[in-house]
């Protein structure tokens, strides 16, 4: 019953945010002119943009495949692509992308991959994913002062908030991994405060769950210490993966035969949006992403700003949602129906 309520809440929340986004973005706009502009866009430039979205999903699957092999688990790359698709699909439709990794762990379990192994792999993917955003965000903040003042004056508070939240998240997860005793003390103290002020009801099993979660962080620390080269390679793959997704907007820009703004400027403007919205409790950053795009890309797209936003978000978010949804269905029909030895993977 509790699970059903959560599913219903997430569904209603997603529909509500989507409806408000559509209303906020398109209310009072000339939709006919916008559609004419979209139809006139050069599809030869949009096709590579869509390919980059697929590459983005594929990039995580390569990381999963690579880390599984470091554990001696031999998986087919197409299986890892299904794991990746499941993660991106449920991340797209749940607040703060909270549903992606639990569902990945569920499907990995269907392939007889233990929860401790999948938890470590998914933890490292999360840390490196956010670490790349932090590096890009700090790089823009420190070395792009002119860039900040030219394009980001109107959204600097949101950018710094997003960057700060990502830095906090990476720092906190690093403490959890490398200082589990300190992390345990902090979390126990936090739980006691929440229970004292009746924000959370006291539950006997909550501390036991906390202890179990600490095992994941200890295992992650052990992996990081014994596989430094693997971690460096994962960070490099993640960086390329993220840059590919940021570059989608440049292909939209070229599809309208626009010029005057360089590739790296467009890429880093899109990166700023990702840094700003990544930690916000909205499915896919819906609503705030569109607002930020319409603010910072005004000097780039000019009169084609709204159709540019529609195509950029259409490829970068809704394209990702569609591709990952299709392969999530495949995952359910192949992996999700498997049982026990029928789904057994090869171990070295």
Walk through the language-model features, giving the residues of each:
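Transmembrane helical segments that form the transport core of multi-pass membrane transport proteins
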Residues: 223-272
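Membrane-embedded helical hairpins/re-entrant loop segments and their flanking transmembrane helices
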Residues: 61-85, 252-269, 293
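Transmembrane helix-loop-helix hairpins in multi-pass inner-membrane proteins
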Residues: 1-32, 36, 90-202, 282, ...
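Hydrophobic alpha-helical transmembrane segments
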Residues: 46-50, 77, 81-82, 158-163, ...
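Alpha-helical transmembrane segments of multi-pass membrane proteins
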Residues: 78-87, 264-275, 304-314
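A short amphipathic helical element positioned immediately N-terminal to and/or at the very start
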Residues: 32-40, 108, 213-225
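Short, membrane-interfacial amphipathic segments enriched in basic
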Residues: 196-215
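Membrane-interface helix starts
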Residues: 7-9, 40-49, 222-236
């Amino acid at each position: 019953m509790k699970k059903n309520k959560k599913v219903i809440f997430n569904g209603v929340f997603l529909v509500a945010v989507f409806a408000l986004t559509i209303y906020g973005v398109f209310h009072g706009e000339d939709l006919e002119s916008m559609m004419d502009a979209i139809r006139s866009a050069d599809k030869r430039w949009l096709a590579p943009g869509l390919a980059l979205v697929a590459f983005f999903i594929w990039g995580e699957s390569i990381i999963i495949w690579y880390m599984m092999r470091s554990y001696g688990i031999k998986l087919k790359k197409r299986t890892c692509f299904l794991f990746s698709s499941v993660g991106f699909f449920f991340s797209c439709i749940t607040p703060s992308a909270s549903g992606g990794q639990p569902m990945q762990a569920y499907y990995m379990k269907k392939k007889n991959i233990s929860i401790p192994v999948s938890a470590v792999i998914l933890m490292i993917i999360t840390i490196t994913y956010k670490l790349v955003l932090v590096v890009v965000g700090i790089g823009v903040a420190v070395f792009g002062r002119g860039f900040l003042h030219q394009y980001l004056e109107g959204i600097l508070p949101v950018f710094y908030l997003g960057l700060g939240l990502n830095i906090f998240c990476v720092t906190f997860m690093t403490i959890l991994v490398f200082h589990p005793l300190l992390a345990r003390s902090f979390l126990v103290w936090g739980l006691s405060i929440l229970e004292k002020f009746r924000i959370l009801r006291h539950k006997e099993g909550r501390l036991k769950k906390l202890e179990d979660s600490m095992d994941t962080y200890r295992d992650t620390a052990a992996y990081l210490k014994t596989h430094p080269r693997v971690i460096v390679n994962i960070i490099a793959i993640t960086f390329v993966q993220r840059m590919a997704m940021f570059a989608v907007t440049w292909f939209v820009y070229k599809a309208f035969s626009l010029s005057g703004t360089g590739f790296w400027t467009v890429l880093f403007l899109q990166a700023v949006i990702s840094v700003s919205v990544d930690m916000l409790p909205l499915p896919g950053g819906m609503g705030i992403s569109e607002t930020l795009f319409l603010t910072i890309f005004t000097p780039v797209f000019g009169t084609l700003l709204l159709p540019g936003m529609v195509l950029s978000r259409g490829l970068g978010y809704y394209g990702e949602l569609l591709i990952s949804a299709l392969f999530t269905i495949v995952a359910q029909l192949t992996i999700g129906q498997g049982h026990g030895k029928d789904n057994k993977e090869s171990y070295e």
